[in-house]
Amino acid sequence: MRYAVFIFLIVLIDLIYCWNSKRSFFIPDFLGSGDGTPKSKTESVIEERMEYGRMILLVCNKTCAKHRSDIPLWLKEFNQKKGYQEPETITYYYHTYRQAVSFIDTNETDVFPNLIYFIGVKRVVFNGDVNIREDVNDWIASLDQLILLEPRVYEDLNVILSDTSNCSSKYLLLADRPKCPQPSWSIVARIAQDHGIQPVKIGHPLDGLTHVLLYKRMPYLSEASCHLSVLLYENSYSDFGDDINPLVVSDWITTLLPLEEGSCPALFETYWHPIVDELTELQQIFYSAELEISERNKRPAFVLVGLTGGIAVIILAFSIFWGLNGSGFNKD
């Protein structure tokens, strides 16, 4: 028993340390040395771009002027066709392969020149003919594919929240609110997809009933938080908080999701909360009305009426006091 408690404390300390040192800790295994220090300029570039975006690396073992001209042009046209802006844009970099480096696995890389795609803590090697534009474009398109759920009404989102009871469905709820945009949300969505998690984009502003659904069925979510990034699994949810760094999210997904052994593997309860049962019609009506009253009380007109009424009461009190002070209360 003591040994089990000791192991639990070690894991907990690791996770806390991991959370408090995000930028330096969440470096992919194929980058840098054991202490996380990059060994080359290319490694530094990969790490920097993967922190919030993604990139394709052209690797040549000798001069390849034509490929260095063609590949960035093809990639630029692909990005323009998709209408991508940073950080969703797939960026480009070049590396001459002269000696062994951590980000090139010779067991995966069959030929040179070659292309390697980086996103989160994942890399994918092309191993095709980089001279054939159609093949390169098809490869990029397959990596770029994003299957996104966008619930439009209360019932759509309600079904998603209830769909993890079979211990196989996994979802990541994301939002990109106008008042606090999250530019990397699509990168995070693709990372989740690579882990077998269905990304879900929640539209804003939320209607009253959908707002009630989110914060009543997941009561530990902070309504004051501007961002939304919530992992759903096994009738439970885990809130990533406001910092949606792709490298952090990728590492946290692998940390939070257990190795699937059996139908319903145990979750690390410290970071998970149970999703509350579906709301009854009466609860929907009550909580929606409660929210409407709360929102109305925040409006300037209601605040002004309350303030004016308060000042009027104070003035009336002073008038009565001075009136009494000058008449019956003054016996002299």
UniProtKB/Swiss-Prot annotation:
Disulfides per UniProt: none
Stretches of the chain found on the membrane's Cytoplasmic side: 323-332
Glycosylation sites: N61, N107, N166
Record's bilayer topology term: Single-pass type I membrane protein
Extracellular side: 19-301
Cellular component per GO, a single term: plasma membrane
A GO BP entry: regulation of potassium ion transport
Locations listed in the record: Membrane
Transmembrane segments: 302-322
Tissues with expression: Low levels in body-wall muscles, eight vulval muscles, intestinal muscles and anal depressor muscle.
Keywords, comma-separated and alphabetical: Glycoprotein, Ion transport, Membrane, Potassium, Potassium transport, Signal, Transmembrane, Transmembrane helix, Transport
GO MF entries: potassium channel regulator activity
Primary subcellular site in the record, as a coarse category: membrane
Signal peptide: 1-18
Subunit structure comment from the entry: May form a complex with sup-9 and unc-93 where sup-10 and unc-93 act as regulatory subunits of the two pore potassium channel sup-9. Sup-10 may regulate sup-9 via sup-18.
Additional comment: Gain of function uncoordinated rubber band response is phenocopied by exposure to the unc-49 agonist muscimol.
Role summary: May contribute to coordination of muscle contraction as regulatory subunit of a nonessential potassium channel complex.
Name of the protein in question: Putative potassium channel regulatory protein sup-10
